[in-house]
């Protein structure tokens, strides 16, 4: 029940305060409790939730169709999610692109963590990468820099094409990426700017290397 999740959220907040006295525990998030600093090397999000058995799970018994319901304390309500199906689709695309999918995810997520100025969740960044065409993420040996070009080109397409931007979905298809309360054009612009800066840095470094030949 919802009241049990609300109680679990309060217990988790108190437990984190007690277990990590030197860290900063941010309890303001509607869906997660964030903790960073102290003995932690990076920010961690704790998301109170409960199991949720979808109709597809009941039909197949396959764990990839089992879902969770995440507490949104601001309403309060529970939001259904299917993380195992999400991961299965990510794995599938990564195989189809020879590892390019996960490289694109790591690249854009690293820019988010390094800059701290990209107002997009890691989930939505991964979802953007998931929608990049497979051919753009498939590269020859030694051609890893093509992943940067693929990410930048696709983000520019999303900037210019509002119909495309508003149509793309998260991997498990339960919502659009760009919708109320989730990814925004501002966040996309910030990500694109960081990708452009990285591409310019790579170009300058390559030019210096050629001049030394």
Predicted ranges, named:
Residues 161-213:
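Terminal (often C-terminal) interaction modules
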């Amino acid at each position: 029940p919802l009241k049990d999740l609300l109680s679990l959220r309060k217990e988790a907040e108190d437990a984190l305060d007690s277990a990590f006295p030197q860290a900063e525990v941010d309890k303001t998030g509607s869906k997660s409790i964030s903790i960073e600093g102290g003995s932690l090397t990076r920010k961690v999000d704790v998301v109170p939730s409960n199991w949720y058995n979808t109709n597809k799970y009941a039909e197949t018994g396959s764990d990839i169709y089992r879902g969770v319901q995440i507490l949104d304390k601001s309403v309060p309500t529970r939001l259904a999610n299917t993380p195992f199906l999400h991961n299965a689709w990510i794995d599938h695309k990564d195989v189809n692109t020879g590892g390019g999918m996960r490289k694109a995810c790591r690249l854009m997520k690293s820019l988010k963590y390094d800059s701290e100025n990209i107002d997009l969740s890691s989930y939505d960044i991964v979802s953007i990468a998931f929608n990049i065409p497979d051919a753009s993420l498939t590269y020859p040996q030694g051609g890893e820099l093509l992943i940067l070009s693929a990410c930048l080109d696709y983000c520019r397409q999303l900037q210019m094409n509002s119909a495309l931007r508003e149509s793309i979905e998260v991997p498990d298809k339960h919502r659009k990426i760009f919708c109320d309360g989730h990814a925004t054009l501002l966040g996309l612009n910030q990500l694109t700017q960081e990708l452009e800066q990285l591409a310019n840095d790579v170009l300058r470094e390559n030019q210096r290397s050629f001049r030394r030949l």
